Amino acid sequence: MRKFTADFETNVDELDCRVWTYALCEIGNTDNFIYGNNIEDFIKWCANKKENYVLYFHNLKFDGEYIFSYLLSNGYKVIKDKKQREDKTFTTLISDMGQFYSIEIYFETKNPKHVNKVTIYDSQKILNMTVEKIAEDFNLPIKKLEIDYKEYREIGHILTEQEVNYIRNDVEIMARALEIMFKENLTKMTIGSDALASYKSINKNFNRYFPVLPYEIDKDIRQSYKGGFTYLNDIYKEKETGGGIVLDVNSLYP
């Protein structure tokens, strides 16, 4: 199953808010770069009957809104459970705080040996940085470019060389960075899941210390799980600081 990074560029005019270009770059084969100038062709590409792709958008919450708009305007139905899948349906994984994690679109489901679908994830849940910073921090040989984002592009706009180079670098940067992550076996949907999987692999007593709770108990406390975050102050970045301290304090989050 091949994996690609993907990106949309859109008009900023509220009265003509649409995708004027899309781009894809294969992870592990960055010479395979694909682009077009409308969302219809993007969806047609995704619906390849011979292959089910996995895509990564950087900030799926933004691009996903355009995907939803197209699907709902073209006869697709959202379903809550994959067991309900049928032709032209899709599922979503979105948190109660509006965080987008995944979209799965089912194009054809009648063949029991091959369900024609595309799975879309948010690479920002793996690398929570801007594309520009990712290129810098990974020491990539390419960098993010610039275009005039406010310029109006009409329907059918033919991309200039500058625009092609811009969107190509965006998806290629992400493809190169994700390839590095995947080679390090960091393949989960989120970096938090990768961290937990790594911790479980080194703590053989994990299941004894943190047993799976009965459903009723979990349901009672589930709403208290809102997580937290790990942050590195820039003044300490890439510096030896000596011994540190660990604080476990309640009620400091959020």
Predicted feature residues:
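RNase H-like nuclease fold core
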Residues: 14-33
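Two-metal-ion RNase H-like nuclease active-site motif
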Residues: 2-12, 244-247
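Short, glycine/acidic-enriched loop or turn micro-motifs at the edges of active sites
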Residues: 10-12, 61, 125, 251
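Conserved DEDDh/DEDDy metal-dependent 3′-5′ exonuclease domain
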Residues: 30-159, 165-169
